[in-house]
Amino acid sequence: MMTKFDVAVYELIKMVPSGMVTTYQEVALRLGNRAYRAVGTSLSKNPYAPKVPCHRVVKSDGRVGGYGGLKESEKKIEMLRNEGIEIEDGRIKDFERRLYKFGN
């Protein structure tokens, strides 16, 4: 069952343009809380991928992070690379330049 929180997360993620990433922390803070892990939980059950591009959400240090295991992490990396994002050693290259921050 989808919660109001899930819907709010999905609506925010749809705002992240191709070629950019955001973080679990950015999403949580934009929603007015610090529930970073709850954001990850919502994205793990995203029924609208890739329309809701959860592959564009990464860790706050620029690491690509989990995506349901190694095979799925490789899929996430491939999707990001297809959008022009360079990844080196599991991290977004030029992370600060690629980081999408939601307006307040």
Q: What role is predicted for each listed range?
A:
Residues 1-104:
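Nucleic acid-binding interface residues in structured DNA/RNA-binding domains
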